[in-house]
Amino acid sequence: MVDLVMRQTGGLAGRRLNDSGRSILMSLALSQVKEELVLYQKQSGSRELVELMLSALKEFKMCGIRPEDLKAAADRLEEGNLRKKIRETGLVMAAYEALVSQSYIDPLDDLTRLKNVLEATPFFKGYTVMVDAFAGFTAQELEVLSLVLRQAKETVISVCVDQDPAKDNGMGLFS
């Protein structure tokens, strides 16, 4: 869906990052903010911290958490290691995002970019949209799905039920 919308609205141009590119940019981001780090300063050049930050980055993006959200969360906490970790993670993520925005498109941002396009363009107006083959939705996916539901003329969602009707004596929701 991302590819289709972006092809028709012009959002595919740019160099797409892969895992190697992400690692390089995360290393650069850690170098840029090294002097501002307390808890992570000693490990800022380590491969392990790069991998840890990339793993956190992927989780945050799927959950729709931005660097400024981390800063706001840290500001609400009392002084301590948790506050420092969240604050420092937000600093690293902000530096990483700034590096990416200079020249690259991160596929991890595809759904966020799609959401932004759908907020500005009624792409699905007049269409019937079918939603199938899912086990659940991430925060990014829910934001996009919400916009699709508002725009589409009709939306059909298949519900997967791996349930034995005999277990509920034929009285279940999908019996």
Region annotations inferred by a language model:
Residues 1-72, 76, 80:
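Conserved P-loop NTPase-based nucleic-acid remodeling module centered on helicase motor cores
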Residues 18-19, 69-175:
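Conserved helicase NTPase motor core
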